[in-house]
Amino acid sequence: MAKIKKDDLVQVISGKDKGKQGKVLRVFPTDERVLVEGVNRVTKHLRAGQDNNGSTEGGLQVVEAPIHISNVAVVDPETKKPTRVGYRFETVEKDGVSKTVKVRFAKASGKEL
């Protein structure tokens, strides 16, 4: 189970883009990969052809490629450094009814994510 979710701010902790931070655009849980904004950019060669909007030009296009989930860590909102993610159960009272909710938190600072 991936502890990284869409729209999380993550930092690359290993690989060619080590140290870069970006927002998670998409999570691929079956492949254990995440697509991070501005990280792991690759050049894609496009052939001239047609699509739904008409003809398209060929050429080179730079796009982000998915990166393995073990190579990124969630950034702590308080310290702005990579941290591990934990879960805890908190009791929330709403309209006189108490309810137990599972929340994610940064292990370094204890702040809720």
From Swiss-Prot:
Q: Which GO terms describe its cellular component?
A: ribonucleoprotein complex; ribosome
Q: SMART domains given for it?
A: KOW (SM00739)
Q: Name the source's superkingdom.
A: Bacteria
Q: Which PROSITE patterns match?
A: RIBOSOMAL_L24
- Write down the CDD domains for this protein, in alphabetical order: KOW_RPL26
Q: GO BP, one example?
A: translation
rRNA-binding among keywords? yes
Instruction: Show the GO MF annotations.
Output: rRNA binding; structural constituent of ribosome
Protein's name according to its UniProt entry: Large ribosomal subunit protein uL24
